[in-house]
Amino acid sequence: MVSAPPQSAAASIARAWLGFTLLLLAHFAVRPLLDTRANVDYLLIGVLFAAVRTRPGLAAVIGLLAGLCVDALVPMAFGAASLAYVVVAFLASRVKAVFFADHVALTGLFVVVGKVVFDILYISTSGGLRGTALGMQLLLWTPVSAALTALVAIVLLTLFRPLYRPGA
């Protein structure tokens, strides 16, 4: 049986950026077509998967750039997505050794927590929701959205495991 040749670091980085770019495109091309209250956050999946492959400083820069892409489309809440993505990416990079194992349940939990933290930060800093609408969003739609995002992340990680493996 012939084993696969070892991959270079440049090939691993190129595959990771390809995966991130595809998730970025899905966030802006597929997500608007499925416009519901509980959306899958493809960009958050990309940011989390990129953050576990990098150090906290670079993860924060990736989060900032992803947040600026989102903030450019919502001038009323400019900076809210950037702040949320930076915090989530930084924290994800810090706890990667604990949560990003080769275990499906831990990966799902990692994405759920990341999505909940992102939504809490984004909604509280954007200032768009108040009162019962805020409670409904945080208590009903955020957990549903987090579960859907985690489900998609698990499916993507299972299908494209070599692309997102942290050590590859």
Model-derived features: positions:
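Terminal, non-globular segments
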Residues: 1-168
